[in-house]
Regions:
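Collagenous Gly-X-Y triple-helix signature in extracellular proteins
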Residues: 1-285
Length: 285
């Protein structure tokens, strides 16, 4: 794999502070981030109605939630962005925040620049990599389940998340891996819902309700990134996954992001999952 690094945005990059100024692309786009259905299915905190949405999208696909930053709160825990874009704190051992990655790569940034397009409120964006994001519609859910029982074609790709619930504060990362299937030239995973609140039902972006333990077909689609020209980095427009613990509760967080469980997940799993479909030889030409 080429020289890719995933990280999270800092408190200063998001809001601005005495050490860093707010990123221009965040100032234009807004601080809030929408979450994917995969975020909800992997334990993200969901605000059920559409009162909490990004400015760009007031529909079910624009619903916001809390997402991690890489900054400490000065009291051994982590700074987060809440569903309204406010600066709040979260215990380092919680799992319900969304992961909104930023991609750093000195090589890739110049290669993908020709594919940039105009985005919301003067921003520019680009599609790069693929990831499971939103649930297929109800009709397709039934079709895919029937095809699955008959035997569907696998692509050879897979995606790894954490199987531990948010309420378990003692257990470390326990990977669960979902294989990717192909149907009519589209890719999907069949994931078991691991909702934040066991026993509740949640409406996904397809308008259907699901309960904890239900299997849901989620389409794999291109990831959209905001282009941060100031820092040669790409910032995911959405929170892509939840359920990942930031740090063991026995370890205080003092801002050393490289030593966190979150960074280990980004490096070991997420960066590979996001870009496994990328043609690296083409990008090097």
């Amino acid at each position: 794999m080429m020289d890719y690094e995933l990280t999270l945005l800092s408190e200063g990059q998001i809001w601005g502070n005495d050490k860093e100024r707010q990123l221009d692309v965040i100032r234009k786009y807004g601080i809030k981030a929408a979450i994917t259905d995969l975020c909800i299915l992997t334990g993200g905190y969901l605000y059920e109605n559409t009162n909490y949405t990004i400015d760009e999208d007031r529909s079910l696909t624009g619903r916001t939630s809390c997402f991690w930053t890489r900054s400490d709160d000065g009291d051994n825990d982590v700074r987060e962005v809440d569903a309204d874009g406010e600066r709040v704190d979260i215990y380092r051992y919680k799992r319900y925040d969304a992961v909104r990655p930023a991609l750093r790569s000195s090589v890739i940034f110049s290669q993908i620049s020709p594919n940039r397009v105009s985005g919301y409120n003067g921003t520019e964006e680009v599609e790069f990599g693929e990831y499971p994001q939103n649930a297929a519609d109800s009709r397709m859910q039934n079709i895919l389940e029937s095809e699955y029982k008959r035997g569907m074609s696998k692509t050879g790709r897979s995606y790894t998340f954490d199987s531990v619930t948010d309420y378990d504060r003692d257990t470390g990362f326990k990977p669960v891996t979902y294989e990717e299937y192909e149907y009519q030239e589209k890719a999907y995973i069949r994931i078991k819902a691991n909702f934040y609140c066991d026993g509740n039902k949640f409406m996904l972006s397809n308008g259907a309700y699901y309960r904890n333990g239900d299997y849901v077909w989620v389409e794999v689609s291109p990831v959209k990134w905001l282009i941060d020209d100031e820092n040669n980095q790409l910032i995911s427009k959405k929170g892509l996954v939840s359920g990942i613990r930031f740090l063991d509760k026995r370890t205080n967080y003092k801002g050393d992001f490289d030593r966190t469980e979150m960074k280990e997940y980004l490096d070991r799993y997420m960066v590979k999952d996001l870009f496994q479909s990328v043609d690296f030889e083409y990008l090097q030409d």
